[in-house]
Amino acid sequence: IVEAHERGMVVPNRKERLSDEDTQAAGAYVAYPKKGIHEWIGSIDINSLYPSAIRALNMGPETIVGQLRPIMTDRLIKDKMAKGDSFAAAWEGLFASLEYTAVMDQQRGTEITIDWQDGGETVHSAAEIWKMIFDSNQPWILSANGTIFTYEKEAVIPGLLKRWYAERKDMQKKAREYEGKDDVQFEYWDKRQLVKKINLNSLYGAILNPGCRFFDKRIGQSTTLVGRTIAKHMDAYVNECITGEYDHVGKSIIYGDTDSCYFTAWPMLEKEVQEGRMEWSAETCIALYNSIADQVNESFPGFMEQAFHSPREMGSVIRGGREIVARTGLFITKKRYAVLYIDKENKRVDVNGKPGKVKAMGLDLKRSDTPVIIQEFLSEILNKVLTGTQREEIVARIREFKYVFMERPGWEKGSPKRVNNLTKYRKEEERLGKANMPGHVRAAMNWNNLRRMNSDNYSMQVVDGMKTIVCKLKSNPLGWTSIGYPTDEMHLPQWFKDLPFDDGEMETTVVDQKIDNLLGVLGWDLKSSTNTANTFTSLFSFE
């Protein structure tokens, strides 16, 4: 707002009475990964994708010229949602509005209405609109959302982002100067650059917040769809560099998430390496993947001009960097994967006898509802898988862990849970006699009730926001299925220890389920292979 005022502009008031339909915008592109173990993985990460997209297309309320009326797109999304899809699921597989796609395909038989910012409207064929944007010397840019911007003047938002981006670069440079020399100064400048990074990334969120004066769904959705289109190009171009095919889900592409691409050239080169026709090492792989990242960066200005009519100078702000090179990786589903990387941003980490470092995303070994002992065990198993340990050895280690875990008392086999709204549910139950609530809240309420029934004034009472350990119970006279005790309770009362804990059920939930979540994609059937109930059969088999 201050920046706009300094330019002599008047900022409009906030829009009122907007429905969800007016504010919902398509989200980021997240691909389904090619599940399983992959070798020699590289990743390219686009620098500040959303802020860069806003700058590259000069997006701002004051630079909007018009909007392709999204009749076809809205109809498609509504039809999908009518069939039960969520708004996000309805956008699955789409990288742009149908109107934008029709324009880029220069479809002569498709008529599209343009709503001009001055209040007028005109109807054209998609082919005519393409010519209007790309072949008429107009200073116009067309976003993947079908929004037309002008680049005659720099908008306030891209101008701010440009300044913040330059300031962050300076702060990062100062942080690097102090790294390893002055910890206090390094931490200071590192935190400063982090704050600036948050500013850069949060501005996109503000544009999509109805409470923001700069709110405009056209800009917000233009940002995400342009981001999707750029990510699709990056994936397709990486695959073209490796296989010769411009395909965003080609043979070399493992996974894509918002602004990053995970790929491997190994399946295409493995035969040549094994036959001795090509040398292969970590150094060779790093050099190859650096070269691919450089080629992708060289492609961006031309792509931005071809896809959006963004001038090459503006399109050049889209840049990617080769982030990691990993020896192996395990990909499970969207947002859940782990890689053992040997190089990060041209800095080797497989030194001093170490195989590298593990980068894990969305796995149970990092979740707060997984017991610490299970987190540590899952980390150990994951490391074994990523370093090439054979199935038989992993099965033996899981079985060994299960025996140790079986010997632990029942109350140590529960799952950590945070209890919220306990007071609300308790009052609701007092008022109605019976209330529906999350299982872990019911378990906490059971602890409080049993504590009162045993006249226990020494044990802690569970209150709102407290962390608990939820333990499952066998059939009992009270009809309870679980109980949750406070994690900070240092001395568990005897009445609690005497409860009929369902050890088997907890072992299945805490061990078998967590292992299956991590390694199920490998198809190793670990549950039956490590079933401790089969011990007698495995020890005494008669043929």
List the predicted regions and their residue ranges.
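DNA-dependent DNA polymerase catalytic subunits
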Residues: 1-57, 61-67, 71-145, 152-153, ...
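Non-transmembrane amphipathic alpha-helical segments
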Residues: 161-178, 196
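Charged/polar positions within long, soluble alpha-helices
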Residues: 173, 205, 236-239
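Flexible hinge/switch segments at interdomain interfaces of large molecular machines
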Residues: 203-212
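A generic structural motif
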Residues: 259-263
